[in-house]
Amino acid sequence: MSGTWMTVRAWLLMLPLLVVMIAVIGWPLVDTVGLSFTDAKLVGTAGNLVGIDNYVKMVSGSNFQRTLITTTWFAIISVAAEMVIGVFAALLLNQDFRGRAVLRALMILPWALPTVVNATLWRLIYNPEYGALNAALMQIGLIDAYRSWLGEPGTALGALIVADCWKNFPLVALIALAALQAVPRDVTAASLVDGAGPFARFRFVILPYLAGPLMVALVLRTIEAFKVFDIIWVMTRGGPANSTRTLSILVYQEAFSFQRAGSGASLALIVTMLVTLLAVAYAALVRKSAGSAA
């Protein structure tokens, strides 16, 4: 069978999927691009053509800049914490001890639960009147009065980061745990015989096997954290005083709360471009890793 026919056959097999992708992704994207160059409202007339004014106003506006900083801090801190906690949990659950299977199953639970459920549970924990966190901190003497952790600008973002880490660190742990299964036990045993300590054993024996999978987890979690919406919307709706407003929430507010469809479309495309840059960086890292391995 000729190479040309194989290529044609491959495209024919992919054609139904391409049609679906164009219908579901392509056309709405084209429509959004067109909408972003207008001053259209969510209801009413189609709006007038304004060129790149929406993009200029969005990028140069203080709301966008503050929100971008908040989103970046949220992504950096939450992903870093998830990576550290996830790797530590994987190393712990890779040991042989009674009840390991039960702990592995329980660890998956926060990640398996719907985000709305997780967010609701954490709202109850942070509740300023009867929340478990306030009660525990009062018992050990760290606070002398109940606090509104989600109602104060100084603590709201940190409280959200904790909830997000709780939700997503199991994914990192599962990826790391799967990679740990590939570490040869004879190599680990040899390092023990050679007198390698825990840190040296992790650095020179275990980490090389974890590097590739952890890079995948790092990039995927960074992309997800950068476009986070659901857990923040359920817990704070971007408040108080916009201290927890992320880019995705700003897009929602611009398009639906303020009913500025044109501005919302331009902002959505800006966020899409930022996330695409992260995806391109991920692809470049994968190619570089594959080239190094070859």
Language-model features: locations:
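Cytosolic juxtamembrane amphipathic/interface segments immediately preceding
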Residues: 1-2
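A structural signal for multi-pass alpha-helical bundles of membrane permease subunits
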Residues: 6-294
